[in-house]
Curated annotation (Swiss-Prot):
Subunit structure: F-type ATPases have 2 components, CF(1) - the catalytic core - and CF(0) - the membrane proton channel. CF(1) has five subunits: alpha(3), beta(3), gamma(1), delta(1), epsilon(1). CF(0) has three main subunits: a(1), b(2) and c(9-12). The alpha and beta chains form an alternating ring which encloses part of the gamma chain. CF(1) is attached to CF(0) by a central stalk formed by the gamma and epsilon chains, while a peripheral stalk is formed by the delta and b chains.
Gene from which this protein is expressed: atpD1
Keywords: ATP synthesis, ATP-binding, Cell membrane, CF(1), Hydrogen ion transport, Ion transport, Membrane, Nucleotide-binding, Translocase, Transport
Protein name: ATP synthase subunit beta 1
Membrane topology summary: Peripheral membrane protein
Annotated GO CC locations: plasma membrane; proton-transporting ATP synthase complex
Amino acid sequence: MKKHTGTIISISGFVLRIEFNESELPEIGFALEYHTHQGTYLAEVVQHTGINTVSAIAIGEVSGLARGTEVVNLGHPIEVPVGETVQGRMLNVYGKAIDGKPEPAAEVKWPIFRAQPLLRELDTNKEILYTGIKVIDLICPILKGGKTGLFGGAGVGKSVLMQELINNISMLGGNSVFTGVGERVREGIGLYKELEASGVLPQTTVVLGQMNESPGVRMRVALTGLTIAEYLRDEEKKDVLLFIDNVFRFIQAGSEVSSLQGKIPITGGYQSTLSKEVGDFQDRIASTKNGSITSIQCVFLPADDIDDPSAVATFSHLDSTIVLERSIAALGIFPAVNPLQSFSRALNPTFVGERHYQLAVQVKFILQRYMELQEIINVLGMAELSDEDRKLVHRARKIRNFLSQPFYVSEKFTGTEGTFVEIEDLLGSIERILNGDYDERSERDFLFIGSYKDLK
């Protein structure tokens, strides 16, 4: 098939205006190929601006690009290699190798734009995916085939928690796809080396769109990772784990592209199409009768604002929400998860059983009551509390400390061996604390242990 060519007539940042013959105008979403002194890149058609002109967003570098440069209409959206050839590899937004190894064989390629599964294809049978992380398994259990969000500001431990989840869940087997969206390259390289050392890399694909790359790359790399996961689900009928770090950078890249196109922003400077962009992306992450995609997504909170439009747009699509809080991190308790702000659709007797559900409700109640009493303690001290309230405060602090945990991925920094806590040991430990079995023990005894079996 003959490939039509066009000519760049203007360049504004990462927005290219390209002229074609009137009969050869590419469709919206089609990929255009162009060359600079740095290499070959793609652009994506986003708007028809005239009878024979289109506007395109560069999905790559524009340094060295000039008016008059020829571009080639590929006649289809960006396509990436999928299947076994990309497992154990580290790729960029185009599906090209960035791990120093030969390019993956492009036996099968899929476009990054795909329709969401039909309603009749969706699978609603859910089971719990236990992670071995106490606060998550107790308060906000993760659904197999569900979507989980890790919300937190800068430096509260989102990426470390994400890496621990990757480590623990990968040990259960299955295929994984890690998508780094606009994050630091050292984190991606570090994760790749850890996966290699732990022996789970052959079942994992790492896709990176780095912080220093163009907004087009950061906006589309999430779709590259998702497309690879969809192929495993639909064609190979496998259960897939999809890790995304960070959804905020995906939204932020969309905002930058929207601004470059001259569109009017909404509250907070976000694009007016925020809800649709997030919805189109999230609705593709689904479980069907062929297989499941279990998604765990980091969401950065600007200025620790849980009501930021980017977070609000993401909330409604999630089954489990895990909120990390700076005040808990300041106490030296990690993971710094706030059990009162975190929730899961799976925390009901149908999914976790009556015993687990009742223990989680009691833990939330005692921590909520402790927060209410904290104001009295700060002003008047513990002496002004009743005996019953003092007992409750001590138990709440023990629970708060007990929900801390040493991680495998931080062993080399802390010198403390990581722990994977089985659900029965977790529930047994919580029962003993709530029943007062450890009322005579110090609160510090419960910091960074696994279960009650580790108490000396």
